[in-house]
Amino acid sequence: MDARMFGLETPRVAALHHLLDVPDGDKAGGGATRTYVRDARAMAATPADVKELAGAYAFVVDMPGLSTGDIRVQVEDERVLVISGERRREEREDAKYLRMERRMGKFMRKFVLPDNADVDKVAAVCRDGVLTVTVEKLPPPEPKKPKTIEIKVA
């Protein structure tokens, strides 16, 4: 059932609905698909900072306790930056959890890149549990010079 029907729409939920809007033909029986719900939860649990720098865009995501093998950075559909992965629970035979507050499971964020982003120049660095993905900007286009038309005498 859609939360909007009960007046429970918050700005965060509205943003998720906008970002993850599924075409009507992709919904089974008018409800959200399992993939849609899973992706919405993964995106809501992955906050990020996006900065515009002089020559690049920077996407900063906290990734405490994850190794680079647990994180994927991809560009899909030519203009969508996807940061995803999975945080797994540490399993030990000689220990049991008394409290589990850290989020486990899959995480994901998608960002539509601006037209001036150079998708061939993407770099990712993970330092001290913080992932920074840098996407360089394309150089600005050269201004078009006016074309001079020769005037003929008739």
Curated annotation (Swiss-Prot):
* Subcellular location field: Cytoplasm
| Cellular compartments per GO CC | cytoplasm
Which UniProt keywords are given for this protein, alphabetically ordered? Answer: Cytoplasm, Stress response
For this UniProt entry, which segments traverse the membrane?
Answer: none
Q: What is its main location?
A: cytoplasm
| Gene3D superfamilies to which the protein is assigned, alphabetical | 2.60.40.790
Q: Which InterPro entries match?
A: A-crystallin/Hsp20_dom, HSP20-like_chaperone, Small_HSP
Residues annotated as domain sHSP: 39-154
List the GO biological process terms.
protein complex oligomerization; protein folding; response to heat; response to hydrogen peroxide; response to salt stress
Expression induction: By stress; by heat shock.
Q: Name one Pfam family in it.
A: HSP20
MF annotations from Gene Ontology: unfolded protein binding
Q: Which family does it belong to?
A: Belongs to the small heat shock protein (HSP20) family.
**What name has this protein been given in UniProt?**
17.0 kDa class II heat shock protein
